Every structure is written in C-alpha cells, then in structure tokens.
C-alpha cells in the first residue's frame, strides 16, 4: 500500500505489535513526491528528540507560504520547524560500548536502512535529490521515500540514477530545509520509547552519512545524538573475503544481490529500490557473519566521529 502525501491530510501510523496508534503530523500537504509505504508486519513505535541550532538562514522563495498538513489544522512549515521540541540531548560518553552491554538492547534499538541520491559526488557542494529509508522491523508505513528539490544546484549525474532537474526543481518537491523535520518525524514514529536508532547505509561512512551531515549542517540542524551510523560496506567486504580469501570479490550492492540470489524491486540507483535491496542484503550479512545487535552497535559511528574525520581530511 502506497500513500501519496498529496492525497491525504491526515495520517496515522498503525502499530501492529501493540494496540497504540501514533499520530503523524507535519507532512507536506502538496508534496506529490513524498510517500509512506505500508509494509504489513509487526512493529513498535516510539519517540525521539532532535534539536535545531539557532542559526539564522535564508532560502530562496517564501517558506511561510508552504503549508503542511497537521492533525487538527494546517500551519506553515516554518512554524513546524521553529516550534519543535528544542530539548537538548546531551552527548553520550562511549555510547556504543555502553549500549552494546545493555541486556535489553533489542527493546531499545531501531534499525533503519537508508539510501541517498545526489546531484553529484562532491560532498560539500552537491545536494541530496532523493532519500529513502526502511525500518527493517516492517509494519505499517515503515518505508519512507521522497525526491528533494536541490534549488539552483544542477544535476550532473542523471545518467546514473535517472533523476533529472525537471523532476525535482518543482514547487511541490520539498527542499532539504523543509524535508529534515519531516524525516525526523518519520524516524521518531519508528523509534522505540527511550531508544536509539541505527541508520544503515552501504558505503555510508564515505558517502551517504557525509552528505546527510553536510545537509543537516547547511540547514542548521544536528544529527540526533541517539542516532548511530553503520556502514554496511565493511561487513560486505568481510563476508566476501571469507568466501574467497584469495580472490577480491566485489562488495557492491548489485554483486551482493547476485551472490544472495536476491531480486531487485525497481530501478538500480534509485533510493527506494536500493533501500529495499539493502534491507535484504544487510540481514543476510548479519546472519553469515553471525553478528548480534551488540556486535553491530560496536561497529557503528556517531555523527561527531564522521564530522571529525571529514574535518581532518579537509585539513590534510
């Protein structure tokens, strides 16, 4: 079941693992590119918090004229952004080790697989033009996908993903500063009470996470401190090396799909298609490598880790 946000003014996320029904609010009403997909399986919904730095920014156009649908009424996007909870989450000391030792880790951790498509490969100057994510626990509306309006930044790699300027440079396609609070709400709707999020991406440390961090910073947001970032590429390399120690096998998503005899849904190098495939591949990898949730947590990075590495590489 695919819900187009432009077709509905009210949404509820149904938890099939419990009797509760969490409200989803703040979706962009006129965005025909924004979709929630209904994958019927058990899930647990919860809450998270995020912060937006108090930095004055300006964007092209009038954001106050862009409306978002909220349960009970319609308010400007800027109001939703500015009036979200600003409760600061204090950084956790040695989060990965502390969390990995928690006996109730499965009750705290939500694993979300993600993928991005961009205008080009330069981490600083290019923009995200598509984002997709899926909670591997499944459940109602567990999958998120939208195009993103990059503004004046031209798309130079349309031959890779097939996304053209005329597809994203449209008023109904949300800009990143409008999309971030919506994406945060999606993650919040999947998060377990008082829990943490593990965001998984293939080649995430070198690509997806750097883009995401740069875009959050550009829009004066911070990646929530209770998000952990896991790159699945090292897992793939480790597994493929164990299969053929003397031969360097490809660890690309396509090669892994062939290795596991998995069928792709949709076009290659589109965010949603890659997410659906990576969700299957990731679970296969964790089984083959016999990795527990604790093992995965210890292999995660924080946004501050990746930001520090980016700053170090820039100086070098």
Swiss-Prot record:
Its EC number is 3.1.11.-. Highly expressed in mature pollen grains. Detected in flowers, senescing leaves and roots. Disruption phenotype: No visible phenotype. Signal peptide: none annotated. GO terms for cellular component: chloroplast; mitochondrion; plastid. The keyword Manganese does not apply. Mg(2+) 1 binds at residues 115, 117, 274. The keyword Secreted does not apply. The active site is at 269 (proton donor/acceptor). Inhibited by free nucleotide diphosphates (NDPs). Residues 1-63 form a transit peptide. Residues 112-282 form the Exonuclease domain. It comes from the Eukaryota. One of its GO terms (molecular function) is nucleic acid binding. Its main location: plastid. Exonuclease required for organelle DNA degradation during pollen development. Plays non-essential roles in maternal inheritance. May be part of the DNA salvage machinery. DPD1 homologs are present in flowering plants but not in moss, green algae and animals. This is Exonuclease DPD1, chloroplastic/mitochondrial. It comes from Arabidopsis thaliana (Mouse-ear cress).
